[in-house]
Amino acid sequence: MALEAVVYPQDPFSYISCKDFPFYDLYFQEEEDQDPQDTKNNIKLGQGQGHGFASNNYNGRTGDYSDDYNYNEEDLQWPRDLPYGSAVDTESQPPPSDVAAGGGRRKRRRTRSSKNKEEIENQRMTHIAVERNRRKQMNEYLAVLRSLMPPYYAQRGDQASIVGGAINYLKELEHHLQSMEPPVKTATEDTGAGHDQTKTTSASSSGPFSDFFAFPQYSNRPTSAAAAEGMAEIEVTMVESHASLKILAKKRPRQLLKLVSSIQSLRLTLLHLNVTTRDDSVLYSISVKVEEGSQLNTVEDIAAAVNQILRRIEEESSFS
């Protein structure tokens, strides 16, 4: 006879002899021949006893102890379409729906907006071509710029060296242009009754090239009150590390060679030199670059050093 039973929650203090049917050994071995209705009554009567059943205030569904829980008769019945002892086929049962599992509306997956591989590859090749053309055009411009100046201004072929050399070359040309400006002479002619008088500027009476010097640091003319007394007319202008020297002195033997060697010994790199002579005077227009480590950082320092060089040259020429 098939026995209908229900599995109740296990009492932690009860005796358990079977994993699937914990109360089978206590009640069902001796009552196999009884009527199923009597068996259910016996199970209900055993709730209040301590024979392995849950107490009358234990809620088997929620795991709580409550007095108002009443067992439903359908819960105590074994499925009638299955023989006793057979397992329930869980594989044939339908899977839980997504709505029940998720607890709400099923989420729609977002479709990623992915570009076509060919389009991405075309964009990459386009960027590479544009960057390649830009670099090619920049190299052409740098090559033209480098060809317009002497090679020692840009000894390396990188962009920073070429641009820096071009800036230095422009500064040197500016200094050279300032030194090559022609003197401005004014001649006024007064006519009187019986004689003509010609007046020239005080510069022409003091010597040639005197109008080349606007604000000299040293002067050998007594009329230059603003300049210190020196061995020659010396004027120095400076822009950053580039300096322009204008020197008007008397001719002396081997003066140019001694002047150039002495200037280079002061850690001044000679960039440009122009020599103009007239009568017994000579005008030197020199462009130099102050090297790192040089002690001459101002126009006053450079002018004083040049004046000292000319003084030494004059002393050597007087002894020879």
Swiss-Prot record:
One of its GO terms (molecular function) is DNA-binding transcription factor activity. Residues 65-76 have a biased composition (Acidic residues). SUPFAM superfamilies: HLH, helix-loop-helix DNA-binding domain. It is found in: Nucleus. Residues 30-121, 184-206 are annotated as: Disordered. Gene3D superfamilies: Helix-loop-helix DNA-binding domain (4.10.280.10). Residues 244-320 form the ACT domain. One of its GO terms (cellular component) is nucleus. InterPro entries: ACT_dom, bHLH-TF_ACT-like_plant, bHLH_dom, HLH_DNA-bd_sf. Residues 104-114 have a biased composition (Basic residues). Residues 122-173 form the bHLH domain. This is Transcription factor bHLH96.
